[in-house]
């Protein structure tokens, strides 16, 4: 099933229809009618991700049984009359949804059901993301493509997709730890009585899981050391770190559903910064490891990164991890190795 809806508004805001501005880019989203996908689509269409001067075509992938729901979402997108939205593709075929894609947000994933072991979940998702990796390899725009994996286990799903796309640079794949990063910023701002924009040089190391390591040791608040400003290592170790690590579970316990709006917002932040840069500021991205800081080559591991204004990321170099940090780093590294081992027979 494949449906394309095109627009040609005549409003003054529609600069592209009047022959001005940029050509549209193609943004593919999997699990498009799900909770996170629903939150994402409207923000992308409004220009929150790529800017108010960038026309887009949304290319939505769903399961066959969810195509009617996707039709309803597409109707809502139509009804918003977004000037930047030049078309919508609805498909249950990965190669169609990824055709010519410049951006791909892989949101849809198999959730863990009652009684399911983690190894079973890994293998179920390995099958999904191997298919999607092959489809990206065959039909996406390899020269411009940026892939963000949101569906969990995100780091290992990114690894699987990338390994199944041998003709695409593995550095064009990433997994999302920006939600963890944003959660940490909010906790630190609250603790220090400051704005989130006052917090700098904070980062997430490792896996998007309960082993992730939110690291404040290099951080500053209004230019002053976070460690010195907080001056409470017990709070950092016993409150802050577990709160960030377990925030997703806490939200499920509170609302009965997993994070959706905050996850979508983090995905927007991740892709916007990866495209336009971070103005010299640190952010956290799970990216292809070349062995930096001892993270095994080939893993998708969260590092502190800076992105330049051309969209090229660089891992922050020269950081010295203390013993506590190194222990946390090693724990999350070992978990990622274990996950990779659990799906090794499905990796090319």
From Swiss-Prot:
GO terms for biological process: malate metabolic process; NADH metabolic process; oxaloacetate metabolic process; tricarboxylic acid cycle. Gene3D superfamilies: Lactate dehydrogenase/glycoside hydrolase, family 4, C-terminal, NAD(P)-binding Rossmann-like Domain. Its main location: mitochondrion. Keywords: Mitochondrion, NAD, Oxidoreductase, Transit peptide, Tricarboxylic acid cycle. It catalyses: (S)-malate + NAD(+) = oxaloacetate + NADH + H(+). NAD(+) binds at residues 31-37, 125, 132, 150-152. It is an enzyme of class 1 (oxidoreductase). Residues 1-9 form a transit peptide. Coiled coil: none annotated. The active site is at 208 (proton acceptor). GO terms for molecular function: L-malate dehydrogenase (NAD+) activity. Its EC number is 1.1.1.37. Pfam families: Ldh_1_C, Ldh_1_N. GO terms for cellular component: extracellular matrix; mitochondrion; phagocytic vesicle. Substrate binds at residues 112, 118, 152, 183. It is found in: Mitochondrion. Catalyzes the reversible oxidation of malate to oxaloacetate. NCBIfam families: MalateDH-SF1 (TIGR01759), PRK05442.1 (NF003916). Homodimer. Belongs to the LDH/MDH superfamily. MDH type 2 family. This is Probable malate dehydrogenase 2, mitochondrial. It comes from Dictyostelium discoideum (Social amoeba). The lineage of its organism: Eukaryota, Amoebozoa, Evosea, Eumycetozoa, Dictyostelia.
């Amino acid at each position: 099933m494949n449906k394309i809806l095109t627009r040609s508004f005549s409003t003054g805001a529609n600069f592209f229809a009047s022959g001005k501005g940029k050509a549209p880019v193609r943004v593919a989203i999997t699990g498009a009618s799900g909770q996170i996908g629903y939150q994402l689509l409207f923000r992308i269409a409004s220009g929150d991700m790529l800017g108010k001067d960038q026309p887009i075509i949304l290319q939505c992938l769903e399961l066959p049984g969810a195509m009617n729901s996707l039709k309803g979402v597409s109707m809502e997108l139509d009804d918003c009359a977004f000037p930047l939205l030049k078309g919508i593709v609805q498909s249950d075929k990965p190669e169609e949804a990824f055709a010519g894609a410049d951006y791909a947000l892989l949101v849809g994933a198999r959730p863990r059901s009652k009684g399911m072991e983690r190894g079973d979940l890994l293998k179920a998702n390995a099958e999904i993301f191997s298919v999607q990796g092959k489809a990206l390899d065959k039909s996406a725009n390899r020269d411009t493509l940026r892939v963000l994996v949101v569906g969990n286990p995100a780091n290992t799903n990114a690894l699987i997709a990338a390994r199944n796309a041998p003709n695409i640079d593995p550095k064009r794949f990433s997994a999302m730890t920006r939600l963890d990063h944003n959660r940490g910023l909010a906790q630190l701002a609250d603790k220090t009585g400051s704005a989130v924009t006052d917090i700098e040089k904070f980062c997430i190391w490792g896996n998007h899981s309960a082993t992730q390591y939110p690291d404040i040791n290099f951080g500053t608040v209004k230019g002053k050391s976070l460690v010195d400003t907080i001056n409470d290592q017990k709070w950092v170790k016993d409150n802050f770190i577990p709160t960030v690590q377990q925030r997703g579970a806490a939200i499920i316990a509170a609302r009965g559903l997993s994070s959706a709006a905050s996850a979508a917002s983090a995905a927007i932040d991740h892709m916007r910064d990866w495209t336009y840069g971070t103005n010299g500021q640190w952010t956290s991205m799970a990216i292809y490891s070349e062995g930096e800081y001892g993270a095994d080559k080939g893993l998708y591991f969260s590092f502190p990164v800076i992105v330049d204004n051309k969209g090229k990321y660089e891992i922050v170099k020269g950081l010295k991890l203390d013993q506590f940090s190194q222990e946390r780093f090693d724990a999350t590294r070992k978990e990622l190795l274990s996950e990779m081992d659990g799906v090794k027979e499905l990796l090319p």
